């Protein structure tokens, strides 16, 4: 099941989740949400990132919430389609 989400807030940290050696690397962007202060990690491809994405950067993410990983196994993930900062 997939649900569209919009997350606005401040970047806390950026970490690599899956390394492929190409621009298809998967990164996790931990964000403190502006609406309630909770923290959420959003997955995105390396091609969506650039050097300006540092801790403290204001960000808005358009993505989707899914309950499956890439192999179809159960997982709670938020995957970014678009990052604006």
What kind of feature is each model-predicted range?
Residues 5, 25, 38, 74:
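Exposed loop/turn and edge beta-strand positions of beta-sandwich/beta-sheet ligand-binding modules
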Residues 6, 60-62:
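Hydrophobic beta-strand signal
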Residues 12-15, 66:
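Conserved positions in beta-strands of structured domains
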Residues 17-31:
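Short aromatic-glycine-enriched beta-strand elements
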Residues 1-8, 12:
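Short, glycine/small-residue-enriched coil/turn segments at secondary-structure junctions
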Residues 64-85:
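OB-fold/S1-family single-stranded nucleic acid-binding modules
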Residues 36-53:
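Beta-strand/loop nucleic-acid-binding surfaces
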């Amino acid at each position: 099941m997939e649900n569209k989400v919009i997350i606005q807030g401040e970047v806390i940290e950026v970490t690599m989740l899956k390394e492929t050696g190409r621009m298809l690397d998967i990164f996790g962007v931990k964000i403190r949400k502006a609406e309630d202060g909770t923290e959420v990690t959003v997955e995105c491809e390396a091609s969506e990132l650039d050097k300006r994405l540092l801790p403290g950067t204001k960000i808005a993410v358009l993505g989707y919430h899914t309950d499956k990983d890439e192999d179809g196994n159960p997982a709670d993930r938020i995957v970014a389609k678009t990052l604006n900062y």
